[in-house]
Amino acid sequence: MALTKAEMSEYLFDKLGLSKRDAKELVELFFEEIRRALENGEQVKLSGFGNFDLRDKNQRPGRNPKTGEDIPITARRVVTFRPGQKLKSRVENASPKDK
């Protein structure tokens, strides 16, 4: 199961006593600020969590899997995430949840 923005808002409502509206707005503002920074070409560093970076990928040759036809894959900018050491350690040492 995935963690959603709605669940984050609910958690803030429960734990911090924020109104549901304020909790939702806080979550939205947090992600909007990350989006804004990345759109402006900035790296996003979240201490104890990880870094969001931008990476430019060059054009490269590719192949259409259905037809086998050679096609170029266009150059593009992608967002990458590199988890920090604290996050890596916590995930590595966490006990798996029953599914």
Swiss-Prot record:
Subunit structure, interactors included: Heterodimer of an alpha and a beta chain.
Region (Disordered): 49-75
Name used for this protein in its record: Integration host factor subunit alpha
HAMAP family, sorted: IHF_alpha
Source organism superkingdom: Bacteria
UniProt keyword DNA-binding, yes or no: yes
GO cellular component, one term: cytosol
PANTHER family named in the record: DNA-BINDING PROTEIN HU, INTEGRATION HOST FACTOR SUBUNIT ALPHA
Known role: This protein is one of the two subunits of integration host factor, a specific DNA-binding protein that functions in genetic recombination as well as in transcriptional and translational control.
KW Metal-binding (keyword) present: no
GO biological process: DNA recombination; positive regulation of metabolic process; regulation of DNA-templated transcription; regulation of translation
PROSITE patterns: HISTONE_LIKE
Family (UniProt): Belongs to the bacterial histone-like protein family.
GO-annotated molecular function: DNA binding; structural constituent of chromatin
One Pfam family this sequence matches: Bac_DNA_binding
UniProt entry keywords in alphabetical sequence: DNA recombination, DNA-binding, Transcription, Transcription regulation, Translation regulation
